[in-house]
Every structure is written in C-alpha cells, then in structure tokens.
Amino acid sequence: MKNILTIVVILLTGFTQAQTHRFIYELQYKMDSTEIGYEKLNMILDITPKEVKFYGKGLATTDSLNKKFGMNSSYTDMTGQVVKRKINSFDNENYINIKNGYYSFKTTDKINWLIADETKKIENYTLQKATTKFGGRNWTAWFCKEIPFNEGPFKLRGLPGLIFELSDAKKNFIYTLVKSRKLTENYSTADFLESNFGNKAIPINEKQKYKLIMEFYNDPFAFERNNFSKSNNDLKININGKEIHNVDELNTQTKSMQEVIRKYNNPIEIDKAMHYPIY
C-alpha cells in the first residue's frame, strides 16, 4: 500500500461521545481518462448523529482561514463530489458550481453490493472485498467491519463497515483512507457547503442542471460578451491572462474553452456525462 494509514483507533465505546467523526481520503483521479498521470487532493467524510457529508478539504481549509483571519476568500470544488444525506440514507443532496452560480439538486442513489470472501490486512485492520456497479463504473471497495460506519467516499455506502479503499475498474478514481479524527462539536459547513462563501445554493432538478451546464458550454464568456460591441475599440477584457480586444478574439477564446471542457469530461458518474457538441 502506497500511503501509510494514520488512522486514529476508534473504540466502540467512543462512537457516541463525539459530535462529528471525520475521515479523510486521498483521492487520485483523472480529469481526462486518456491521461497517464493523476490529480491528487484530499476529501472529507463527516459523519454526525444525523447527517453524512462528503466534500473537498479545500472547502474546509478556506472556510477555516476566513474565520481565523477575517478573510473573504472563496473556493470552488471542481470534483463534482459535494454531497449531503441523512444518516443511513441513499437520498443525496448534491451541490455544484456552474459559472458564477451555486446550486443543489436531489438524487436517490441505491448501491447494491456483492460481498466477497476475500480479505486482506492493512496495518492492524482486516479489510473485506466488495464490488458494485454505480454511475456507469464498476467499483471495488475494501471495508472494515471493525469500524461500524456503513459509509464511504461520495455516494458509495451501505456496507457493514467503513470503506478504507475504493477504486473503479479503469482506475480513474482511487480513494485511500489516510486519517481520521473525532471532533468534539458538530462541525458547521453552513458557509461552504449549504452555501458557497456567500452564495446560497439554489435548488434545481437534474434537467435544469444539464440546461445550465450546456448554456455555459455554448457561451462560457457570456458576461464578457455582453460588455463588448464591435464599435467599441477601447474596451479590453482579460481572460486567463490574455487581453481580449474584440468579439472575434472572444470567439477564439470561447472555442478554446469549449475544447478544454470536452477534454476534461470525465465525471465520477460517467453515465451522466455531458454530450457536448463540436461547433
């Protein structure tokens, strides 16, 4: 195993004493499925007596710095894996950034596992193998009955023990549990999950979500475009470090952005991937 687990030993008698059980997973993932290398970041799984939340550690870090130093920074989680659900539930509230908006939508994501007899040891923990198909991908999980939480990364839950390792068959997404801790208080995510640093999540449905994403793809610089007119030669707009002087240059940037969006179209739920047209 590449990463040494630094799991805090959680005694069964301690499960009801802390308000939040936090598990941190290292996520290795491919934004483009054809790439060889991986992006890496840490994801947080928070389990409270009533709710379960999964989100990027960058959100919590930014929120903590804002509170500590009176800052007003923001952070956009681009993993598409920010979710919240009630304990012991497959009904998820999903959170997503689209352009400058922040939205939430509901899904029911039942997971049917096939538990194998195969086991392995990681440090002092015995892990058991389980497989499932979810989101258009085939998944293998290794869970630990000694840690009696039926949770895991993202929406992958429902096993008789905490998931320590999780990966899809093509190794596009690889999760490894690296740390855990017990928080004495119910950790508030109100400023970065239920809202995104000042932008409260707007409830939508999945059909509306696809419409918003496609609108962004069709014209990713719609706001900038509204500020342009071909007769206004003095207006200059900076996009990704490049100075744009007219609509023709903006159109070139639009095509470049669309190429990037199509290239990095490898969501964890691949069966819900967007089918972007090429203009």
Feature names for model-found ranges:
Residues 1-23:
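Bacterial Sec-dependent N-terminal signal peptides
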